[in-house]
């Protein structure tokens, strides 16, 4: 999942709820703990390889941080019922999966020239050598920053986004991610790829970094001594750290291998997994 800029916490949460029967509000805080210990290795790889879009990173962080605080209160005060929370989780996952698969199933849709050119370069690079992927000289370079538009260059192509739109989206996502325990990157990443047509090779590091910072805030919020309906919101730190150790290795490997994997394959794998989980959790609400 780190190949697409997602920490994997959105898949870890259903595992904890279904297999471990861990359904109290503190499960969201435990997910934040996982992010804190798992993400740094992936972020390190993206920074080292020059594929960290810093302007995008700071906009995401600025928007999601205040949203996470509100999301914490939503989870603890209004989503304490496991059945209702699973339905909420299913709706979030359905959105993520549909965004990833949308442009894969649409026919006749012309991609932006920059995104299309990038895919063509990747195909040519693959055909030239068996181990070819994104070349080492392909790094993110910021070209222009303003309140209306931020532009950056990657592999000879120019990509841009509106920072105000991204900030508002990040704030809303922060609320959802704060309640869900994912930090928000799992929702922002497919939006950046599908709606803004930014390549996964450049947004993955930014969304992971944003998730890391907001997860620190989320874990602190959930660690506040607060008991609602006889249920504590305190994260299970040992469990979160244990998950994080495994995630640390997975994040590093995923970030390292990303430049060798086509974007289409990344979207298909993630999309199918997420859609399956979302349908499962939505249906359980009506049974």
At which residue positions do the language-model features occur?
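Transmembrane alpha-helix interface/packing and boundary motifs in multi-pass membrane proteins
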Residues: 1-5, 171-181, 214
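Hydrophobic alpha-helical segments that either span membranes
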Residues: 2-10, 27, 184, 203-205
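Hydrophobic alpha-helical transmembrane segments of integral membrane proteins
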Residues: 10-11, 59-62, 186
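Interfacial segments of multi-pass membrane proteins
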Residues: 12-26, 187-202
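Juxtamembrane transmembrane-helix boundary motif
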Residues: 18, 24, 45-173, 194, ...
